Amino acid sequence: MTTAMGAALRRIQLGNALSAFGNGFTVPYLYVYVAKVRGLGAGTAGLTLFTLAVAALIVLPFTGRAIDRRGPLPVAIVGTVSAAIGSLGMGLSGSTPLVIASAAALGAGIAVIQPALATMIVWCSTPLTRSRSFATQFFLNNLGLGVGGLIGGLMVDEHAASSFIRLFGIESVMFLVLGATVATVRLPAAPKVEDAMPTGERPEGAWRALMRDRSMVWLCALGFVMFFACYGQFEAGLAAYATEVTRVSPAMLGIALFANTAAIVVTQFVVLKLVERRRRSRVMALVGLIWTVAWVAAALSGLVHGAQAVATGLLISTYVLFGVGESMLSPTVAPLVADLAPASLIGQYNSAFALVKQLAMASGPLLGALLVGLGLHVAYVSLLIMFSLGITVLALRLGRRLTAAQDNPFVGRTRRAEALAAAGSADSVESADSVEPVESADRVAVAA
């Protein structure tokens, strides 16, 4: 990775961290703000969260083509402006139509930003540095969210709408800071993706080309299961289970969420050293087993009666184990998407995977809240245990479809170097033994 690429990457990650910092001010309080502070009711609050998800689902199918045609930089800037407008509008809105319109702008903007930033990171990294680049982004993102949430909690007053206007105003400014930061980035002229599949004709056939890539389709299926089993449960299913079955207080639930973030921040770079030279498919399979243990701990927390401290400890361990698994996935999944993508379809692949994530994030809370709300607690936890085990099975099956370089770039690079060295040695021996010097010189020239 060149010095210019490193400088560009640092700017991208700085902007992303500041944006996450602003996002942390509002994420924990959006439901309370709409339902209680603005007095619009639980129905409108639920519709607001639904609008955020639907807006993302609408724009993501078109985002990849825009990134591949126009480049990730202008797309990211458009996304930050939309998100900033939506966030500020959310803080100033006092009626249902304005809240929904602001949520649409906010959801669409955030959805556009994610694959654009991912593509910029791919352009500014190499296969050997990509895992560390995405791990650093994930670390900074969680650190920003955690610090922002902590400061936001000190500033918020649910009896004063003005305090929420400040929170959303800060978030809006941070989105604009992200846009201004990435606008100063000097991206490489072309993406540096090795071992890409043949690009074929595009852009009209971009989605068809992606669907023909069986490894990518398999990874998308795996991604849906992963996001459904973890992120898709944080906001609704697991939170409802924790309060209704484990019977922890909302304050203790906040501590559990903080433990999740702390686990990521503390373990990210330790985990990175352990996994970056391992087979990616095996790392994802291990995450499935870790999350299986996490859901078993959650199940046990609901069965411990008369020992609330033990139940609370089990629940917090669930969130900690989720955090460890997340820190293992950050240097694994996003780089694999990039390495599977043809050079001219990086944006399309990133957007497709973001779309899969959004689908899981939309369906996960819906199903989780429904099962817990109906009192089907055993069925809920059993389903998530099966999903977690499914991660392991799907990851191992995916590993059979990947090349050595895709599953482990370090091994792939080593094998290529050994092959080139062996070829060079063979050419040298052949040249030395040749009776005709001119012919041997031709062979060396061709080999070079």
Briefly describe each language-model feature range.
Residues 3-54, 217-257:
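Helix-loop boundary and gating motifs at the non-cytosolic
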Residues 39, 71, 92-97, 247, ...:
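Helix-breaking motifs and short loop linkers at transmembrane-helix boundaries and internal kinks
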Residues 102-143:
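Cytoplasmic helix-loop-helix junction between adjacent transmembrane helices
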